[in-house]
Amino acid sequence: MNLYNTQCPVPKEQQPVHEYTSLKNSWFFCWPTLSRRSYNKKITIALLLNCLLVSPILLSIFPITKLPLKFFFSEFITSSLMTGFILIRLYLGWSYVVKRLMSATVFYEESGWYDGQIWVKPSEILLKDRFIGLYEVFPLLNKIKNTLSFLSLMISGPVLLFFYF
């Protein structure tokens, strides 16, 4: 029996559990739910696509024949920053959902922006939502944070070398 259907006045698309499942099933936000290998593959593909995207622009700024090191460093830095923005977007989406899952109250709108309501979760629903938040979503947030940390460490070397050369 779904507790949300019987006890909850919140519209289905605004219920925290529904938001969690819709994120988990979406094309982009499902990346952290994949296995470590598949997740790393997606991030690497995003990094390589960003490299291809910024190469023509950076070639016009740093000609590869005259400034090859500046070109390669700037390409790596720029594509890594763009990949970092992708990871930040993933993090923000999942952190919004975990905040709604962990909260004892749910803010919702019945028909528009002018009639917002607050619903206090019953203890059964609160326990279920917090369980999902702690054991399903927090590990995903940690995975994204670790990837962002690794990416920022990888960027630090080329940034210093960019200004040296």
Swiss-Prot record:
The keyword Plastid is annotated on this UniProt entry: yes
Annotated organism of origin: Pyropia yezoensis
Main localization of the protein described in the UniProt heading: plastid
Gene Ontology CC terms: chloroplast
Pfam families, per database record: CGLD27-like (PF06799)
Keyword terms, alphabetized: Chloroplast, Plastid
Keyword Plastid part of the UniProt annotation: yes
Family under the similarity heading: Belongs to the ycf36 family.
Localization terms from the record: Plastid, Chloroplast
Protein name per UniProt: Uncharacterized protein ycf36
InterPro entries recorded: CGLD27-like
